[in-house]
Amino acid sequence: DLIVERSFTTAATHQGYIEPHACLASVTNDGKADLWCCTQGQYNVRNLCAALVGIEGSQLRVTASEIGGGFGGKTTVFIEPVALALSRKAGRPVKIVMTRDEVFKATGPTVSTSIDVKIGMTKAGRITAAEATLRYSGGAFPCGTIDMGTQSAFAAYDLAAVRTRARMA
């Protein structure tokens, strides 16, 4: 009966989590490595660090510490591969803790978005169809936000007809 179309934008913002990024890396002479870090995704950290430092993922054990909140900002790596590389070179454990200033300058904020939404509904207000186009300004470092946005755009509604599209702009 009715079609409503709206456009929305969100700005890039930093998650503002409580504790800064910190890690402790230890690489032994036989190439095995241990990494303790503040993360929301130790398996992603293991895979990224192994690829960046050039070691087998099976040789890297990542232990996630308790975090006070990450809000999606602690799912990737910043200092962890550096600590691993330095530990391998020094033959000793290496600890890196970012200052609050370093966190805001050197870690990634959420990306900004431009979203167009089109919703079909009955005159009684029941939503019958929904469509969304999401454009993320990920720049040179696109992220997994596309998947999360397209999967959750209308997840709260029981709809028979849904279409979501997303791209990095």
Predicted regions and their residues:
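Structural alpha/beta core scaffold segments of enzyme domains
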Residues: 1-169
